[in-house]
Amino acid sequence: MTISGKDLAARLKARMAEQVATFPAKYGRVPHLVVILVGDDPGSQTYVKNKAKACDVVGIRNTTVRMPGDTPEQELLDKIAELNADDTVDGILVQLPLPKQISEPKVIEAISQSKDVDGFHPLNTAALWQKRPNSSCVVPCTPMGIIRLLEDANYEIAGKNAVVIGRSQIVGLPISKLLLDRNATVTICHSRTKNLPEIARQADILVVAIGRAKFVTGDMVKDGAAVIDVGMDIDENGKLCGDVDFASVEPKASVITPVPGGVGPMTICCLMENTIQCFLDKVAAR
């Protein structure tokens, strides 16, 4: 079964729009997300436009701050500090990747934890891994989108063997933790993993986030596996594809996400959820 992130995202955004529509009467305003775009990378510009469109659908106020590609690191940090201090701003997102003169870790850490809608701040990462009772932490958007997709497909995670190919702070590590929290047994693979195809074939749930076009083929997947493709690559014909060879894997999978239209729309959807969460956490703290 191919599960559409586009369809699920549309349903969830409609539900969020109903929620946000009640905010002016309750709180006097709607959430406000600020996205900072440094440079003119075409891919980043597309991502930022898609985020703005999603905000418009949900009813979230959104502002895009555009800075030239040669912006000094300190200038970007000063802008973040300004937005951190602005009480009308609920969420701050700096579009990655950044130009080489700017340290991504330094920028991520500069964003206030309470406005970190990406969930990348070290304190949010720590809260996710510590799983503190009653703690409110923002979960990275792509991993949360994957969980939403599996849950919407009524796929039982508990007791399953999950293999995650990729160990990034953005996807691989946090999705491993979310799967663990739902009682899966998780194996994390990476570029140095030996016998990777053999390990992948043991997976009931296979999450692929390695950044290599059509890396996972049908002979690496066992019958009935749930396959989640996080990749966004270009194939030999110049067409958009994922890290999974959909044509050979789809006949074997019980559940599979396409590229495009799978995980991508859910990433943006969960960004909207995180922005609303940051807004409501601020309101509750007053």
Residue ranges and their predicted role:
Residues 1-27:
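Positively charged, low-complexity intrinsically disordered leader regions
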Residues 96, 210, 230-231:
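Glycine-rich, N-terminal phosphate-binding loop of Rossmann-like dinucleotide-binding domains
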Residues 105-112, 116, 125, 231-285:
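Rossmann-fold NAD(P)-binding glycine/threonine-rich loop
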Residues 38-52, 136-226, 235, 239-250:
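Glycine-rich phosphate/diphosphate-binding loop of Rossmann-like nucleotide-binding domains
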Residues 55-69, 186-188:
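Short beta-strand elements in bilobed, periplasmic/extracellular small-molecule ligand-binding domains
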Residues 75-87:
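Short, well-structured alpha-helical segments in soluble
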